[in-house]
Amino acid sequence: MEHTILILILPFLSFLILGLAGMRMKNGLAGAIGTVSLAGVTLLSYLTAFNYFAGGRTAEGVYPTLTPYNFEWLPFTTNLHIDMGIMLDPISVMMLVVISTVSLMVHIYSFGYMKGEKGFQRYYAFLSLFTMSMLGLVVATNIFQMYVFWELVGVSSYLLIGFYYTKKEAIAASKKAFIVTRFADLGFLIGILIYGYYAETFSFTPQLQVLAVAGSMIPLALGLMFIGGAGKSAMFPLHIWLPDAMEGPTPVSALIHAATMVVAGVYLVARMFPLFIGYAPEVLHWIAYIGAFTAFYAASVACAQSDIKRVLAFSTISQIGFMIVALGVCTSMNPHEGGLGYMASMFHLFTHAMFKALLFLGAGCIIHAVHSNEMSAMGGLHKYMPVTHWTFLIACLAISGIWPFSGFFSKDEILTACFQFSPVIGWIMTGIAAMTAFYMFRLYYCIFWNGEWKGHSHESGLGAHTPHEAPLTMTFPLMFLAAITCVAGFIPFGNLISSNGEAYTIHLDMQIAATSIIIAIASIALATWMYAGKKQPVANYLAHTFPRLHTAAYHRFYMDEIWLFVTKKIIFRCISTPIAWWDRHVIDQFFNFTAWSTHATADEIRDMQSGNVQQYSIWFLAGALILTLILLV
């Protein structure tokens, strides 16, 4: 496994080369350097996965945890130090495959999508940095190393979301993403420091006897760490940055939503899962409730959005909620006794990465063809874009949980885990799954059917044009991801990844599976009835019948306005303003008085320096007399 270090080195070298010398290169060469390096990373990731899982299990029946590279970076005490290295276990190996695959498809796709864009070389440099950061995060040997790459992921996302730096919206979106996640990451950092202090290590597997002494501080540390994960994974109410992140290039959205930034929080909880189960089960259950509410909220908002990318953004938030719920409903490390959700969450992370990347890249082809994000400017595109149409349909069926596509298998395992934990949670998540099928096929019909194409004129004034299929560099990733989406559900995932590391054979709960399929088909039928027609009479009727609800959902239930009120009216006015007054009128005046008194004293002392030697002698004798009296007394 010595070659695993190249998985990090190759994209880093690509970033350095393109960042330092990219502007001297032609676009094709810059793109080729980034893409070839990612192709190498992908091949190495596949080789690592094959060697790891083909190597077999240990005598205890679990896959081993390998550390091909590890060195001490910063020592603090005998036990407490920060290491840097590479750790391979089932979930880190799986994430290597997911990240490298999606990133490679994004690199290939960007050849066509970003053609002619200013800053092409800079774009590929940032893509390489983004990919390297996430790869480093998932192979981290300890929580502090994870935090280092965690922050690199945040910086990379800031650079890519704000790629179009001449657009005010892109600048605002990148700042918003950076600031919101920084607030969350503060909780993550405090949690890491508390954990390191009481556990006497930054390792993912501390000594049990040390944790027993730490008591309630470990649950506190884990809860604070989850705040960081909630910010990265856009959990309510820290989700507000993700929809605005759509201002970046569409391929970047695919990478952020499918394989990098937003799944980092899920990976964090999965990585710390043994500690959550052993020392903070109540925190884990609260995580489930937060995930369930987030999934419902995001699904509700997605039903009313008109921007194709924002529908997919809220879809991502909802699906991340599913993964978080699956982890939160676990009550045991044994998959047969309450630990099924761990495997289900990782399974859904894998399948979701493929079909969500497919959806975003398909959306990019559509935007590339019609030059608009608004669904009202689309319709009837199935005639003009057959490859995009069929691959997009496959992704919609997968995310809706229709057999035999991959989303059916992973979502069914999540629902089974939820019903094992609580029938109430199970039915809530089933209802959210139905909403998912509805808003995804609302999106599908508004884009590809819904009458004839409305037409669009180029900004250059060339007049209306007919939409066209994207070039092969853009459609090949669609076909590749669609193929994976069709077959990924049949991977024996439980044999590779489970909560306790032992092989687990997935058994479909036929009652739950049948119920979820029936409800999904009913939701698709409802979307067909409402949106497949040319004039959408039912949809328009409902929007006018419930205008306040529709408007509230369209405006994301005014969460942006609420956050603006909290920050501007409460934090800035009620907290920052008094603090600023105290700083100016108390702190500043204190130091001003100190400076004035020092200056006044100096003036008085200066007057004593008259140049008269006799006067100096008198002062000297007086001082000596005073010192003598003090010593005698």
Task: Please tell me what each predicted stretch does.
Residues 8-23, 104, 230, 234, ...:
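N-terminal signal-anchor/start-transfer transmembrane helix
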